[in-house]
Curated annotation (Swiss-Prot):
Localization of this protein: Virion
Keywords recorded for this protein, A-Z: Virion
InterPro entries: Aminotrans_V_dom, PyrdxlP-dep_Trfase, PyrdxlP-dep_Trfase_major, PyrdxlP-dep_Trfase_small
Chain positions recorded as pyridoxal 5'-phosphate binding sites: 58-59, 184-186
Signal sequence bounds: none
Name of the protein: NifS-like protein
Organism phylogeny: Viruses, Varidnaviria, Bamfordvirae, Nucleocytoviricota, Pokkesviricetes
Keyword rRNA-binding among record annotations: no
CC terms in the record's Gene Ontology section: virion component
Swiss-Prot/TrEMBL induction comment: Expressed in the late phase of the viral replicative cycle.
Amino acid sequence: MASILTLDGLYAEVPKFLPEALREGCAGKNPLSFYIQQILNLMGCDGNEYHVLFTSSSEEANTHMIMAAVRRHLLRTRQRPHVIIGAAEPPSVTECVKALAQEKRCVYTIIPLKNFEIDPVAVYDAIQSNTCLACISGTNAVVKTFNKLQDISKVLRGIPLHSEVSDLVYQGCIKQNPPADSFSINSLYGFLGVGVLGMKKKVMQGLGPLIFGGGLRGGSPNIPGIHAMYRTLTQQRPSMKKINTIHKLFMKTLKKHQHIYLPIGGVSAEDMSAENSAKDIPSTDVPVGPKGLPGYILFSVGHRAEELQKKIFTKFNIKVGRIVDLQEILFRIKIPQKYWETLLFIQLRDNLTKEDIKRVMVVLMHLDTITPRGSLPPPSYSSSFS
């Protein structure tokens, strides 16, 4: 039975006979509406910002998006549309674009990998007056390195960005919640698999009528497959929604307290010690995070280091002076004694356990109850958080 996507992003028609087991959590609601909202929640997306279409696979979602963008451009002008694609895109993207180019319905530019990722500057340089779409995945095939989707989206300046984000979703990489105008996900669930095509409202208004014909038909609503996708997401990434909650609480606390940002990519403990000595700042003697990982530093203004150490590190069983072998990394950095502040470095990785989440939440909730006092200039070796 065909399903129709209405303008509010929900399916108007649903199967009338569903096994009770597949209605888990629906509480009498439209099953598809329920799954749409839950999947968006797991991704950390705003349900009011995105429209969702279920397809047979992410491959179908990718081709729908490319075809719609090319068709819209051809309807507006006789100039052949230009598509930007990454060098490590899935076959559904490259084959679709190349097939359209062979039919002389579009031209395309392939952006090569630089240091195993797509360089936003190269994307900017590839933009032409007839560019109608950029297809850059969240992770690059084979090498599985992350692309800077946020930066790429900025340089495109209004040109739609479509991204395959299956790996980002299944790895729980919340810091790259799809900033793309549209995204696709594959369920990774075998023969019952379905795909997801998510589109922001502004994209839906322009390209939506060109997808599935003018009627916005999304094919048969494969409820068992959609349910299986939802269950797979919740089982493989049981902490994804909580990770997003932690992230929001962390950002809220970060804005509340005075803070600094300490980039740690490629920095070793020895480098930090040498740099601190050079600037007359006491050495931390604390190892920094693994090379290449970003770092956030948060400190509470007006509270002595010993006070917060007792309340946080001792009470919550988190040791100072070493990287905790968990998914959150908390350590104290010494700065000139006249400031006597505590700096907390929190790094969220992709495989948090429930116990890890509880410990991070306890620390953040405690910090959220502290009222900032006074003012503290950041150490000269750190840059301000942006």
